């Protein structure tokens, strides 16, 4: 795969919310091998539960779920690895070549969502911890009723190293911070005000959610990423882009094939592309003393139909076609951590991770846990203080699959 194609995927992976097409002119200055080791080949042929056939990016609109995780040495020492970490950022993105359009929908990490891997509602951030990228894809499909064709996952460590490689960034910190450092081995203290931040400090600003909300956190992440790309556009940063590419490449994973990336690059880097962004609308909710973000069915339907239109699929006019509405009709509300009545589920709202495991007998056993060993919820030590509740987090039945937020 040539560097033109690799750079296209790297831009998508690192940004998570904005695709800077202007960087296409720099493609031929980038690394030759940044993404070979990051390809998830065993899931390259995954077909969405909501598709009759696997999509062809060269001929059809597609969707990609972008996942940002925080995998560091401190958390690994506590038994958490990349496959069992929570997702800190989740962006469902559609690519429509005929409209020259990319649409990105941000899904807040605390969104209450059905997770097929475990068979009950929980925070959507936990889906990745329960079963990796495929479990996260299944959860998004179950909630949104929109096909999720591919995923790109990036470790937040890439953000830290990229900021440092580019010499830091300037940002107006909204309040005094005292946050865990990148490896969760100490604290980072930052004063309020406009200042230059190194990678660890920038990540601390991006991660904090004790002073405001999950939505504000997402907005800060967008601002910091945009600033980082503006920094990369500076003339004196161009000679550092090769190193940035290597940084992102070693901290990413995806299930796109070389030919699929080639098709995407051909269509979206050689044409003017309109970028649209949105975020699920909803309300803060306390369920059993735990904070959740509860998107309205109206918002889910609205954005699902926009995304489905991008994918050239028919709209969903009946709210009862959304699982959340059927559950509310049946129980009166969404009930977390409680197995659902099977009559509420449709065949596409099933776990595909065990199916993938069966077809890949030699795969790493940590990627797909047997249903008899599914994780149980445990107290989340990083509670959302402004909501006054204690969060729940997935935890394995053994230390191998334990999770730390």
UniProtKB/Swiss-Prot annotation:
Biased composition (Polar residues): 393-405
Top-rank lineage group of the source organism: Bacteria
Keywords, in A-Z order: Signal
Bias (Low complexity) ranges: 360-373, 381-392
Biased amino acid composition, Basic and acidic residues: 348-359
Entries under Pfam families matching the protein: LytR_cpsA_psr
Stretch list, region Disordered: 348-405
Signal sequence bounds: 1-34
PANTHER family: POLYISOPRENYL-TEICHOIC ACID--PEPTIDOGLYCAN TEICHOIC ACID TRANSFERASE TAGT (PTHR33392:SF3), POLYISOPRENYL-TEICHOIC ACID--PEPTIDOGLYCAN TEICHOIC ACID TRANSFERASE TAGU (PTHR33392)
NCBIfam families: lytR_cpsA_psr (TIGR00350)
Recorded family membership: Belongs to the LytR/CpsA/Psr (LCP) family.
This protein's name: Uncharacterized protein SAOUHSC_00997
């Amino acid at each position: 795969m040539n560097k033109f194609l690799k750079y296209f995927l790297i831009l998508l992976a690192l940004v998570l919310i904005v695709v800077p097409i202007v960087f296409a002119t720099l493609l031929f200055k980038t690394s030759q091998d940044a993404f070979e080791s990051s390809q998830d080949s065993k899931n390259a042929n995954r077909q969405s539960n909501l598709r009759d056939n696997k999509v062809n990016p060269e001929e059809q609109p597609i969707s990609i779920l972008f996942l940002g995780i925080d995998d560091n040495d401190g958390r690994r020492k506590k038994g958490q690895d990349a496959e069992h970490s929570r997702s800190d950022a989740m962006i469902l993105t559609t690519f429509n070549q005929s409209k020259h359009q990319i649409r990105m929908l941000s899904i807040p990490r605390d969104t209450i969502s059905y997770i097929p891997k475990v068979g009950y509602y929980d925070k959507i951030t936990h889906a990745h911890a329960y079963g990796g990228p495929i479990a996260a894809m299944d959860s998004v499909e179950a909630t949104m009723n929109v096909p999720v064709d591919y995923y790109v996952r990036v470790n937040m460590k890439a953000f830290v190293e990229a900021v440092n490689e580019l010499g830091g960034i300037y940002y107006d910190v909204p309040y005094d911070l005292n946050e865990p450092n990148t490896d969760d081995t100490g604290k980072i203290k930052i004063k309020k005000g406009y200042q230059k931040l190194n990678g660890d400090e920038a990540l601390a600003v991006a991660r904090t959610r004790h002073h405001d909300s999950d939505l504000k956190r997402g907005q800060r992440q967008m601002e910091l990423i945009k600033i980082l790309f503006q920094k990369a556009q500076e003339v004196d940063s161009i000679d550092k882009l090769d190193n940035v590419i290597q940084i992102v490449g070693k901290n990413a994973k995806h299930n796109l094939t070389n030919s699929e990336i080639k098709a995407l690059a051909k269509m979206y880097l050689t044409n003017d592309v309109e970028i649209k962004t949105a975020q699920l609308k909803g309300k803060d909710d306390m369920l059993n003393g735990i904070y959740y973000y509860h998107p309205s069915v109206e918002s889910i339907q609205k954005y699902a139909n926009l995304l489905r239109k991008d994918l050239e699929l028919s709209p969903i006019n009946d709210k009862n076609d959304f699982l959340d509405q059927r559950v509310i009709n049946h129980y009166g509300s969404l009930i977390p951590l409680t197995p659902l009545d099977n009559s509420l589920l449709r065949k596409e709202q099933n776990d595909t991770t065990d199916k993938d495991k069966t077809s890949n007998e030699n795969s790493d056993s940590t990627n797909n846990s047997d249903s008899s060993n599914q994780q149980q919820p445990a107290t989340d030590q990083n509670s959302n203080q402004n909501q006054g509740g204690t969060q729940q987090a997935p935890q394995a039945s053994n230390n191998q699959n334990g999770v730390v937020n």
